[in-house]
């Protein structure tokens, strides 16, 4: 039996958050349904952030209410603080993904808080869940390979956050190349260090293809033993607080690469291409994935 790689679809959240064309909730709901029809089982569907700061993420509660609970499907809500956690719990999210930035410079611009304050917020959320219940919590360490404001990010900066999350019992930890500056060699080193810092946590990796290294970084992660990768249908993506950051690795391109190499993903690359074209028509931007241009093979 071939090894299975789980792909977390982040198009409805990370993919859309930086688009100028603000979509209404019904279009976002339809996009999620199309992705699920293509085989996506874990989808970062919404973000519980202030809609005044990120208008594209408005309507999170409406979207969650419109998605029927289904066994085997997980709709993830992004959370930055206790207020976001409370909204995620009230909306019956299947998972909450808490983000902690690896640098103060990015954290203050993106979340209005430095690293120490963000880690404290994570601790508050974890303890609140222990007392009151709520969905499983994962952590994403953003700008884990480089920061648009502070430049290089050291391995020690990243592993300090990973170690803190592990001490709190966070079960899944992701390292995110938010601005697309990572390379496969550094990726392997960060994975090794994260495993030492959090030996019991499941690792997930999140790459952008800003400088053309996204798929190489994803494959390096798989070779290093990582079984969970984020990707965005159509290669949508960016960050409103990260200048020049462009799209995530395209889900359909990642599926093509992995399945050609003999891995299982459970996703239909052709259906993903069509979903990418559908959402592209609504935001006025064609998908940037290679598969949407060249098609699959054979």
Task: Annotate each predicted stretch with a short phrase.
Residues 1-298:
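Catalytic cores and adjacent flexible loops of soluble metabolic enzymes
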């Amino acid at each position: 039996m071939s090894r299975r790689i789980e792909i977390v679809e982040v198009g409805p959240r990370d993919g859309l958050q930086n688009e100028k064309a603000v979509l209404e909730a019904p279009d976002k709901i339809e996009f999620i349904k199309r992705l699920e029809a293509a085989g996506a089982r874990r989808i970062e569907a919404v973000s519980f952030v202030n809609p005044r700061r990120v208008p594209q993420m408005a309507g999170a509660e409406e979207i969650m209410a419109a998605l029927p609970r289904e066994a085997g499907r997980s709709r993830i809500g992004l959370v930055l603080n206790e207020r976001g956690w409370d909204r995620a719990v009230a909306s019956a999210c299947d998972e909450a993904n808490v983000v902690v930035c690896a640098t103060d410079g990015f954290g203050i611009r993106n979340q209005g808080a430095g690293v120490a304050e963000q880690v404290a917020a994570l601790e508050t959320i974890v303890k609140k869940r222990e007392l009151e219940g709520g969905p499983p919590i994962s952590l994403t360490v953003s700008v884990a390979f480089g920061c648009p404001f502070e430049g290089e990010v050291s391995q020690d900066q990243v592993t300090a956050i990973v170690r803190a999350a592990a001490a709190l019992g966070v079960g899944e930890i992701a390292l995110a190349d938010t601005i697309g500056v990572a390379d496969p060699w550094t990726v392997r080193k960060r994975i090794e260090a994260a495993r030492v810092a959090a030996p019991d946590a499941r690792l997930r990796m999140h790459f952008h293809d800003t400088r053309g290294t996204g798929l190489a970084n994803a494959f390096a992660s798989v070779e290093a033993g990582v079984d969970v990768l984020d990707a965005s249908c159509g290669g949508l993506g960016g960050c409103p607080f990260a200048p020049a950051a462009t799209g995530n690795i395209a889900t359909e391109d990642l599926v093509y690469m992995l399945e050609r190499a003999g891995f299982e993903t459970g996703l239909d690359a052709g259906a993903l291409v069509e979903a990418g074209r559908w959402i592209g028509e609504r935001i006025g931007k064609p998908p940037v994935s290679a598969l949407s241009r060249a098609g699959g093979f054979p």
